[in-house]
């Protein structure tokens, strides 16, 4: 059985981020451009954050009541556990302290999951001799480019050409 670490997710961390956004007005602007809903591993947290992000983009206030209403309007309130679940999440958080650090950690966990899934796919392709090697290399390059951009380290990495001295 895989642990949360092996799955590269942390449900408590996800809830800390969502809870902070529910209880503090200044929290969502700190993470809205750093996180995407799919970065949340737990489906309910994914749905809650998607609703909050949509509300923020539309200029709507975010709190326990408005998020509950937004989820209900989207037909997702029962799927996330109802009003009780939103209340439970918000009650677990005292403040938005360390929110940006939590967001960075969540982003890193998501990137690790993406890496694991992408590399599994590449390993599967390499085992299938009917797949053209050039196609595998192109897919490898796409995966690495996507991961570089998601990590925000693209500007700090050197190209393969520079590393092997062809440029």
Summary of predicted features, one role per range:
Residues 83-149, 153:
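Extended, charged alpha-helical coiled-coil/arm scaffolds that mediate oligomerization and mechanical coupling
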Residues 1-2, 131, 165:
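Peripheral, non-AAA+ core regions of ATP-driven protein-machinery
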Residues 1-111:
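Noncatalytic partner-interaction/assembly domains of nucleic-acid and motor enzyme complexes
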Residues 150-167:
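Phosphate-handling catalytic cores of nucleic-acid transaction enzymes
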């Amino acid at each position: 059985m895989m642990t949360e670490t092996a799955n590269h997710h942390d449900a408590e961390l996800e809830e800390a981020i969502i809870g902070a956004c529910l209880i503090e007005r200044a929290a969502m602007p700190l993470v809205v451009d750093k996180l995407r809903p799919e970065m949340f591993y737990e489906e309910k947290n994914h749905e809650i954050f998607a609703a909050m992000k949509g509300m923020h983009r539309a200029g709507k206030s975010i709190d326990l009541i408005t998020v509950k209403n937004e989820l209900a309007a989207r037909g997702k309130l029962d799927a996330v556990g109802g009003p009780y679940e939103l209340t439970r999440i918000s009650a677990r958080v005292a403040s938005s302290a360390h929110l940006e650090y939590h967001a960075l950690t969540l982003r890193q966990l998501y990137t690790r999951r993406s890496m694991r899934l992408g590399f599994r796919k590449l390993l599967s392709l390499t085992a299938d001799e009917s797949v053209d090697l050039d196609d595998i290399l192109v897919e490898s390059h796409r995966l690495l480019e996507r991961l570089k951009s998601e990590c925000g380290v693209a500007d700090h990495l050197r190209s393969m050409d520079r590393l092997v001295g062809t440029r």
